[in-house]
């Protein structure tokens, strides 16, 4: 599977601050971050969308009401080195190690 080295993230501004919306991966399907924001505002998605305080998936996760979004800006952010370094399979990798490595990658890109 091909994994990205960069991601398109939407920075949303509300009265309470600025947050980042990341693309959502469900299995092999990825929903674009702007599609998540637009869908929530049109009623196709739930109005409370998951956002991160920083442009990093490891930052605190919270939910905001999409109807309170004032502005939305798309940005490109780099995937952290600790994740991209896992893309290359080591020569001496066991099946158990591969499962852990791929699980770590998939957990990073899944909704948390």
Swiss-Prot record:
InterPro entries: DUF7209. Pfam families: DUF7209. One of its GO terms (cellular component) is virion component. Keywords: Virion. It is found in: Virion. This is Virion protein 6.
């Amino acid at each position: 599977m091909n994994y990205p080295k960069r991601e398109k993230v939407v920075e949303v501004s509300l009265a309470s601050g600025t947050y980042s919306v990341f693309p959502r991966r469900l299995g092999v399907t990825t929903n674009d971050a702007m599609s998540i924001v637009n869908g929530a505002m049109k009623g196709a998605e739930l109005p409370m969308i998951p956002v991160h305080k920083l442009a990093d998936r490891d930052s605190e996760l919270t939910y905001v009401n999409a109807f309170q979004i004032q502005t939305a800006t798309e940005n490109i952010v780099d995937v952290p080195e600790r994740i991209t370094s896992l893309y290359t399979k080591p020569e001496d990798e066991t099946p158990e190690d591969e499962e852990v490595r791929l699980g770590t990658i998939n957990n990073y890109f899944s909704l948390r």
